[in-house]
């Protein structure tokens, strides 16, 4: 993680939106939901994020039942939100739609296959609280790829 701090530390607990673009993720969705829910609840318990924080799943016109899973889960859990695109527009458009719909202090994006280390979300929040405006991570290897990412 590269660091350039130009601001003072923050005193207010930030709200967080985790934006997750999804396309045909019916198999990965339950694992993604479980992992991100654990992270969100952990951050809430440590009082690192505000109670109005949430996970936003953006369905990019999936042809499987990804949207149905998102919709059902969002009706059961108040910290889950869903956004459905009318058709497949591509990962970047789904990501942009999610970022545009996030209404929080901090927004983190992550792919539904959890190929990136979700444990870094807490470190990113810590950096934000130290005063950083932009925090991003770069993987230096692919040894942590999930089984979904490695599948042919």
Model-derived features with residue positions:
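Structured catalytic core of nucleotide-sugar glycosyltransferases
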Residues: 1-146
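A transmembrane-helix-recognition feature enriched in membrane-embedded lipid enzymes
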Residues: 146-152
């Amino acid at each position: 993680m590269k660091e350039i701090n130009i601001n003072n530390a923050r005193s207010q607990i930030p709200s967080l939106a985790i934006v997750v673009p999804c396309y045909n993720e019916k198999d990965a969705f339950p694992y993604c939901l479980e992992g991100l829910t654990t992270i969100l609840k952990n951050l809430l318990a440590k009082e690192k994020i505000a109670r109005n924080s949430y996970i936003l799943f953006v369905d990019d016109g999936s042809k499987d039942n990804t949207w149905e899973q998102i919709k059902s889960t969002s009706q059961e859990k108040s910290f889950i939100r869903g956004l459905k695109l009318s058709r497949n527009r591509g990962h970047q458009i789904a990501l942009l739609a999610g970022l545009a719909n996030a209404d929080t202090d901090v927004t983190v994006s992550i792919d539904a296959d959890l190929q990136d280390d979700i444990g870094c979300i807490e470190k990113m929040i810590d950096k934000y609280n130290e005063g950083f405006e932009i925090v991003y991570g770069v993987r230096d290897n692919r040894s942590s790829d999930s089984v979904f990412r490695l599948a042919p």
